[in-house]
Design a protein with these regions (language model features):
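12-transmembrane solute porter fold
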Residues: 27-50, 63, 139, 182, ...
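Central cavity-lining transmembrane alpha-helices of secondary-active solute carriers
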Residues: 71-85, 136-140, 327-339
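Extracellular/periplasmic helix-loop-helix junction of adjacent transmembrane segments
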Residues: 51-80, 119-121, 320-325
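Hydrophobic transmembrane-helix bundles of small-molecule transporters
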Residues: 180-293, 299, 317, 324-325, ...
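Helix-loop-helix hairpins in multi-pass membrane proteins, especially solute transporters
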Residues: 89-220, 408
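Cytosolic juxtamembrane N-terminal segment immediately preceding the first transmembrane helix
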Residues: 1-42, 57
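Structural signature of transmembrane alpha-helices in multi-pass secondary transporters
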Residues: 34, 41, 70-73, 77, ...
Length: 483
């Protein structure tokens, strides 16, 4: 059985640095279902933000209940993304992709029919979350394998990450339109219809490698890593209810994560294949880029939840009004994404990521200052536009730096880790910023400001991490994978 790296080096999917080489038309058509899959998964993570009031009233729950459903969805994605990536070798990349789509679709329909919060969490958070964890790793692995020259691959990654950012930013607008025109349940039916269309489009997908059922799978590592992440994030969610429970869950989560890495080291010393190789954490450039990637999604989802909840719960805006305000962020991300390739030709990856953080932080400051001085909902638009531009400028460069820090044979592993880190950032953004907001709803203006200040401080950490990246960070893989 040839490995992923062997096929890329020796087979018809041979790697080339020829900037003129272009993928064939059939290969370019394969990008459509992959990009749509990333779009709908990102959309699912943000569209519920504008339904907070509608869902809480219809299901007789609270704002915190809806926050929990959103956070658990993002958390399940993060917790199972690496195991999902490992299963692609065992089951096949296309098979995992389609299975994930089917599970996601079932979860969307179950959510649409949910009679209460429990079924909503089962359908949206669990089924859709696990489905996403199965289908997203193949998106990035297949893109790496099918787009074999560096220029077309960078362009393909730009399309996919751009669609992810647009899905996350457009989620409130589309979700708001559907919720106001029909019902919040129709938004989940919309997701199921898009997923069905992707399943049809994926019939033309080709998997360059056959599945290998003998590929080892580290079940213990999967349980330890997933349980650790779940405990940490759920502990953060409990901070406004019981600090002792929160501290206990976070402590257990940290112990489980430490136990996971000890387990991985033991597996490697025994010559066995762990869930995640420790080699992935020995690359300083990749580590820094992963930090920036995590914080980018933390800021995007944190700002989306805080602004959406504040507009609906405090200002009394409905779903469509809230969604329309978020068109500013959507326009910013879309505009910056369209310019990403041109900017990458003129500036280093580090410069783009640093600039993105500076613009995003400026947007958060504007959100703080204008909202305090101006009661109109449009006071949010300038800040959201800046945040969209900043995030759109740096989402693709961060992915490029991470993926390019490793040789071809490690692309599957680093892709899974990269997606896990991004989704963990999304869940932390909703959990941390949302908890700061919800805990102080008795004094909403103060709690809104506190949540934004927390996000700004985290954004500063991302700016520092990006400044530490090598000045020549590029999209060219190193020979050894270590820098």
């Amino acid at each position: 059985m040839q490995s992923f790296g062997d096929v890329l080096r020796d087979g018809k999917y041979e790697m080339t640095d020829n900037p003129v080489a272009r993928p064939s038309a059939p290969v370019r058509r394969m990008l459509l279902p992959l990009a749509l899959a990333q779009f709908i998964c990102s959309f699912a993570g943000s569209n519920m933000n504008v339904m907070i009031n509608d869902i809480s009233v219809d299901l007789d729950t609270t704002v915190q209940g809806v926050q929990t459903a959103i956070t658990v969805f993002l958390l399940v994605m993060a917790a199972f993304m690496i195991p999902g990536g490992k299963l692609t070798d065992r089951w096949g990349r296309k098979r995992c992709f389609v299975a994930g789509l089917v599970l996601y679709g079932v979860g969307a329909l179950l959510s649409a029919a949910a009679p209460g919060l429990g079924i909503l969490i089962l359908g949206n958070s669990i089924f859709e979350g696990i489905g996403t964890a199965l289908l997203i790793p193949p998106v990035y692995i297949l893109t790496t394998m099918l787009f074999t020259d560096m220029k077309s691959r960078a362009r393909a990654f730009g399309v996919i990450t751009g669609m992810g950012g647009i899905g996350a930013a457009a989620g409130p607008l589309i979700g708001g339109l559907i919720t106001t025109a029909i019902d919040w349940r129709a938004a989940f039916v919309f997701q199921a219809l898009i997923v069905a269309a992707i399943v049809v489009l994926s019939r033309g997908l080709e998997d360059p490698l056959p599945p290998d059922p003998t590929t080892p799978f580290d079940g213990i590592g999967a349980v330890l890593s997933a349980a650790g992440l779940v405990c940490i994030v759920m502990g953060i969610l409990q901070a406004d209810n019981a600090l002792s429970v929160s501290a206990t869950l976070i402590g257990i989560g940290i112990l489980l994560v430490v136990g996971f890495f000890l387990h991985v080291r033991r597996f490697e010393r025994a010559g066995r294949v762990p869930l995640l190789s420790t080699d992935l954490f020995r690359n300083r450039t990749s580590n820094l880029a992963l930090v920036t990637q995590n914080i980018q999604w933390l800021l995007l989802m944190g700002v989306a939840f805080v602004v959406s909840a504040f507009l609906q719960v405090v200002r009394g805006y409905n779903a469509i009004e809230t969604g329309v305000i978020f068109t500013a962020a959507t326009a910013g991300i879309l505009g910056a994404s369209l310019l990403a390739e041109r900017l990458a030709d003129r500036h280093s990856q580090r410069a783009l990521i640093m600039s993105g953080f500076v613009v995003t932080l400026a947007g958060i400051v504007v959100l703080l200052l204008l909202v305090r001085a101006w009661t109109s909902a449009w006071a949010f638009a300038p800040g959201l536009l800046l945040i969209g531009v900043g995030l759109g400028a740096m989402l693709t460069p961060s992915v490029n730096v991470v993926q390019s820090a490793f040789p071809e044979e490690q692309q599957g592993e680093i892709s899974g880790l990269s997606r896990c880190v991004s989704n963990l950032g999304s869940s932390l953004g909703t959990a941390v910023a949302g908890t700061v907001l919800v805990v102080g709803l008795a004094t909403p203006n103060r709690s809104y400001a506190a949540a934004m200040i927390v996000l700004a401080c985290i954004g500063l950490v991302g700016l520092v991490a990006s400044a530490l990246l090598p000045a020549t960070s590029s999209a060219t893989p190193s020979a050894s994978g270590a820098q």
